[in-house]
Amino acid sequence: TKPDEGTVLFDGMTDLTRLDETRIAELGIGRKFQKPTVFESQTIEDNLLLALNVDHSVKGTLFWRGSRDEAERIDRVLETIRLTDARYRLAGSLSHGQKQWLEIGMLLAQDPKLLLVDEPVAGMTDVETHQTAELLKEINKEKTVMVVEHDMTFVRELGVKVTCLHEGTVLAEGTIDQVSS
């Protein structure tokens, strides 16, 4: 969604409102929407391989040979999203929460600077919600993560700075307790 007015600066200088989705991704911004979009008829590993930043042209795809670095990156992503033991399972067989984690992994495979995550725990069990909070906190040690979420219990578990918006205007900013009062 494009804003009605104003600018959105990335790295302090690039106005994202003037760019298309491809260029935004090329800058290192990974976006994950509420409903998971994974290739259900492919394995978890294949989903991650498809997400790698490689030449996806016809020629590039036909002659692509995975490098050791790419294999190691896939291994690291699988470990991060806690799906190593399921790497050869079809994505369609995963629970809703696991599909969300796979999609987060697909973003990580692209090595973004910033992850924008919309409603990551919608439809998850309490256990999956807790595991997702742990996953995002782990990712946030190395990457910038911005979460849009209505589940305040989950937001509290993240333990991060909160910005409360209403129709594009900042209403409050601070800890969850400060914003809630």
What are these regions (language model features)?
Residues 7-27, 62-65, 178:
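ABC ATPase NBD Q-loop/coupling interface
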Residues 61-86, 113, 134-137:
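Conserved ABC ATPase "signature" region
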Residues 115-119:
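Catalytic Walker B motif of ABC-type/P-loop ATPase nucleotide-binding domains
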Residues 129-141:
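Helical segment within the ABC ATPase nucleotide-binding domain
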Residues 155-157:
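A short, surface-exposed alpha-helical micro-motif characterized by mixed small hydrophobic
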Residues 173-174:
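ABC ATPase "signature
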